[in-house]
Every structure is written in structure tokens, then in C-alpha cells.
């Protein structure tokens, strides 16, 4: 019996550039809910000046927006339940462990 590589039974992926554009649109929509649109426009212009209309520029913009949103949520976004007492911590109903360690 001869060895054969496994057949690709996974669903076809969409092309990389379409995926990057979709992710960028989603993260831009989320960023608009949390940051001043003028700031986002300035950031977009800066990235465009450095990279033009390229996938590399889109990737850099995604990375910057992901980091900014992460720091924003971690600092206590008022639109998020993460990191703020006003939104409530979903894990606060779990009693603390006693004498486990």
C-alpha cells in the first residue's frame, strides 16, 4: 500500500486579500464605536501615506486598531463589561475558592 497525502476536504477559503478587507471593515466599525472618527481618519491617512493602498498597509492598520481596542477595553471601556464595575463582571457571581492552595 503506497502512502498518499491526505486529501483536502476542508471548505475552500476565500482569497487572502478579501479576508483582510473584511477584517479591516469589521475592526473599523468597532473602532468607530469607541474612538473619535477624526483620530481614525488621521491614522488611516498616516498608514496610507506610508504604505499606499496595499495589503501591507491594511495589515498594519488592523494590528494598530487591535492593540488600541485591547488597551481601551482593558482600561475600562464604558461600552464593555470588561474591566469596569459599571458593566458588571460576568464572573463576579462565582464565589472565591477557600483553602485550595
Curated annotation (Swiss-Prot):
It is found in: Virion; Host nucleus. GO terms for biological process: symbiont entry into host cell; viral penetration into host nucleus. One of its GO terms (cellular component) is virion component. InterPro entries: RetroV_VpR/X. Residues 80-101 are annotated as: Disordered. Stimulates gene expression driven by the HIV-2 LTR. Prevents infected cells from undergoing mitosis and proliferating, by inducing arrest or delay in the G2 phase of the cell cycle. Cell cycle arrest creates a favorable environment for maximizing viral expression and production. This is Protein Vpr.
Amino acid at each position: 500500500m503506497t502512502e498518499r497525502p491526505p486529501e483536502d476536504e476542508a471548505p475552500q477559503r476565500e482569497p487572502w486579500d478579501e479576508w483582510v478587507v473584511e477584517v479591516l471593515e469589521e475592526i473599523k466599525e468597532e473602532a468607530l464605536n469607541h474612538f473619535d472618527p477624526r483620530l481614525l481618519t488621521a491614522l488611516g491617512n498616516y498608514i496610507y501615506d506610508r504604505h499606499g493602498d496595499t495589503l501591507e498597509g491594511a495589515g498594519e492598520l488592523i494590528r494598530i486598531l487591535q492593540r488600541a481596542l485591547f488597551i481601551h477595553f482593558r482600561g475600562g471601556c464604558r461600552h464593555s463589561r470588561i474591566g469596569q464595575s459599571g458593566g458588571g463582571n460576568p464572573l463576579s457571581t462565582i464565589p472565591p475558592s477557600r483553602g485550595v492552595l
